[in-house]
Amino acid sequence: MKKIKLPSKVTVGAFEVELICIPHDISYEVSESQGAFVGNPPYKIYLDENIINHGGKDAVNVVVHEMLHVGYYQYSLKDKDEEAVVNAYGNFITELLSRSELKDWIKDNI
């Protein structure tokens, strides 16, 4: 069965985010992480290509984790109370799983 490829961009609400896979060594040397969200337009998420190419739940976890940073930024959650954060993330995740370009890739990798 053919695997669904990670989309090159994801649109959630008014935000369009470019997904960029980078070599594992650079990912760890530059940010010591598996992914990084750039919160200035044009919005980008850099992802460790080894994890993404391997696929599965670990890849989904990294992508969803970085997309949640987008939601945090998009909904201005820095100084919000728990209910506002939970409500915003509920809405954001629903949008991510139901209408974004990532929905089929996520389903294929879980």
Label each residue range with its predicted role:
Residues 2-57, 70-74, 78-91, 110:
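Active-site scaffold of zinc-dependent metalloenzymes
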Residues 62, 66-70:
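Catalytic glutamate of the conserved HExxH
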Residues 95, 99-102:
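Acidic/histidine-enriched, beta-strand-rich ligand/metal-binding domains
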Residues 104-110:
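Long, well-structured alpha-helical subdomains associated
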